[in-house]
A protein has these predicted regions:
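Acyltransferase
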Residues: 2-87
């Protein structure tokens, strides 16, 4: 798993992102997710999602701007039997 530590003091998901949302959505238009082997639970919707959702640029735009439903997503994962979580 590749990662990069970000120099931020808090989560974004706010109106401060409005100026970049169009460009961000355009950048996401080329994404191509493949079917996964384990469920992915969206912190945007608190539902299990598949590659068709992950391939929608508008999904990522909304994900950048809308509130995170972290607790609800963890509850869904727990209901599905998960006991270890990776964010």
């Amino acid at each position: 798993i590749n990662y990069r530590r970000l120099s931020v003091t808090g989560a974004a998901h706010s109106a401060l992102l409005e100026p970049i949302l169009d460009r961000f959505q355009d950048a996401c238009a080329g994404l191509h997710a493949e079917p996964g082997q384990i469920p992915i639970i969206s912190t945007l919707t608190a539902d299990v999602i598949d590659e068709s959702t992950l391939n929608q640029a508008d999904y990522w735009r909304r994900h950048m701007r809308q509130p995170v439903r972290f607790i609800q997503s963890i509850q869904v994962a727990h209901q599905l039997g998960a006991r270890v979580f990776l964010e």
